Amino acid sequence: MAAKAHAILSASSSDRWLHCPPSARLCETYEDKGSDYAAEGTDAHALGEFKLKTALGLPAEDPTESLKWYSEEMEDCTSGYAEYVLEQVEAAKETCADPVVLIEQRVDFSRWVEQGFGTADCIIIADGTLRVIDYKHGLGVLVSAEGNPQMQCYSLGALELFDALYDIDKVSMTIYQPRRQNVSTYEISKEDLYRWADEVLKPTAELAFAGDGNFLCGEWCGFCKAKNECRARAEANLKLAQHDFKLPPLLTDTEIEVILGKVDELVSWASDIKEYALQQALSGKEWSGFKLVEGRANRRYNNEAAVIDAVEKAGFDPYEKKLLGITAMQKLLGKSRFDELLTAYIEKPQGKPTLVPESDKRPAMNTAKNDFMEENDNE
């Protein structure tokens, strides 16, 4: 897989700059440091691309030997991705003799977004439907295809290539995220997608490219390079932090509901500020009223081989025998083999109750009050 260039208004960051247009130019002033998670995702994409091309009879070079983050889990995930795409291709062949299938296709949506381009993992065109499939290797954030601006930008780029060649009337977008057991699909008419592009995407992209518009903080701040020093984010969180807090029983229900809706972002922001200040201090910056000290440290062996030798000579066993945890075991065996051998021995206890917004897709728990009411209803 060829190295990818990055646009100022990239599709992958579109959720952020569509909500907060000035963040695009602000982030341009920061170095792109990357992360281990991003590198792992790049490796997974390369492996998935190879498997798909091989299955489709296209020339491809096996990248496995050069993949730093290769694992049995990645092998399983990318095999599942390839199988899923092939299933969609076979389904397309039921209504179209010769569907168009493209892997890692560069798309250009600069008609709406200045310098707008990206790479679609898979595009399938058949029977009036343009289908875009995107592989997500990430585990931390569940990604939905519904109203996903990255997917909509890729779809617009694909329409730029093929709308004049094929009679397309519907666009289907799928997120394949195997480590979260998530396959999310969203469909939209071509007309509605173009309407969004003209009425929302294009005018907001013009603001963002010019560095104009208003700063707005929200969950999209999580991947913003400027999140630690952003004044708008600080002001929004400090406004909540300066709330005239009383003992919780004295707050009204409405006040508590407002706080619940914002407290996670407040905690995240505070954590980001602490980490930023620490890294700056380690680089030599002095913060008034604060100093660097050594944190708590645990004892450790400085020569494990010598410890083993000494303990064994004394007649003791220095090793602890402990079963691998579920995540480590799945990584060792691979998901398919893990499921085959151990599914019967896995249980998932009830999780600890937590308050989440109503938009959360998990079903609501039954409280003791609800259980009591249900019992009375059944009497």
Report each predicted region and the residues it spans:
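Short coil/turn segments at secondary-structure boundaries
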Residues: 27-29, 60-65, 99-104, 215-221, ...
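Short, charged, low-complexity amphipathic alpha-helix
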Residues: 172, 194-264, 363-379
